[in-house]
Design a protein with these regions (language model features):
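Conserved, structured core segments of small domains
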Residues: 2-131
Length: 131
């Protein structure tokens, strides 16, 4: 005699129970932070560079994972004109808080900051490090 109790249930455990028991993988929710410097911001940028880097290293305090980040440069390939980040976060509010807390924002290096949700279509797969 089988231990089957009902449709899809064996030994008192259904297929649904197996699905509930599985570990849910967090899917990355990506955002782009696009920040442009003030025209006269190069000296201020240099002054707060170290604090900005520390802020990036501590992104997880804001529930944000920095996937990639870099300096936007003029066509000469060297002169900084802004910053760009791709971040993984639970929601836009976390990204906004993270961006507003950046020393470049707090010390007026950036003139404008835009945040956009980002739907990655190509490139290296991104696995969320958020729990």
């Amino acid at each position: 005699m089988s231990a089957e109790v009902g449709y899809g249930v064996t030994n008192g455990k259904s297929a649904w129970d197996d699905m509930i028991d599985c570990t849910i993988e967090t899917k990355p929710m990506l955002f782009v932070i696009h920040a442009l410097d003030r025209r006269d911001g190069i000296n201020t940028r240099a002054k707060f560079y170290r604090a900005h880097r520390i802020h990036l290293d501590q992104a997880e305090r804001y529930n944000v994972d920095v996937v990639t980040a870099g300096t936007l440069v003029a066509d000469d390939g060297e002169t900084p004109v802004g910053s760009i980040f791709v971040v993984d976060a639970k929601d836009r509010n976390a990204v906004d808080t993270f961006a507003r807390s950046d020393p470049y924002h707090a010390n007026s290096v950036w003139e404008t900051v835009q945040i956009h949700a980002y739907n990655k279509k190509r490139g290296t797969p991104i696995q969320s490090r958020r729990s």
